[in-house]
């Protein structure tokens, strides 16, 4: 996690979280310095004097795809008690929409296609506690596609994925093709980015 003071990401009952002077604004995973600086500059300067429950901005970029293929990352971030906002690139939008449909702790998915005014509106609603309607997303992965992606990223062959998912190889090829359409790049390109 990264806030302006480098506070570690801990459980919501931790003294570190309760004493955070930056009103609990965090970025996870905290590997991209520019992403962290941009988020903190935009949020802390605008909302520093307001009590907010806490927000974690998730750097949901393609280079972090391995983090987001099972539910453990959501469990980890939910333990803080913070609201979760996913900031994703175009390739990861379908996966981000899938996770938003799976868990209400994820309050929004922000993509590079949204205008600044729309992004500010989303963040305002979350900070001030307004309830946003949860829309069904057009481009969202399904459970089988996420499971396939998890197995493929772990290095399994299509045949072993077929066995593990208890389905025939033709169905696996259909899932692979569906993923390509929703993500916008091939599986090979996804794994090499």
For each predicted feature, which ranges?
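C-terminal output helix
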Residues: 114-122
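Conserved phosphoryl-transfer motifs of two-component systems
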Residues: 105-110
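Residues within the DNA-recognition helix of helix-turn-helix
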Residues: 122, 174-178
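Helix-turn-helix DNA-binding segment
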Residues: 134-171
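Basic, Lys/Arg-enriched C-terminal extension of HTH/homeodomain DNA-binding domains
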Residues: 180-193
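DNA-contacting interfaces and partner/effector-binding or oligomerization modules
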Residues: 1-102
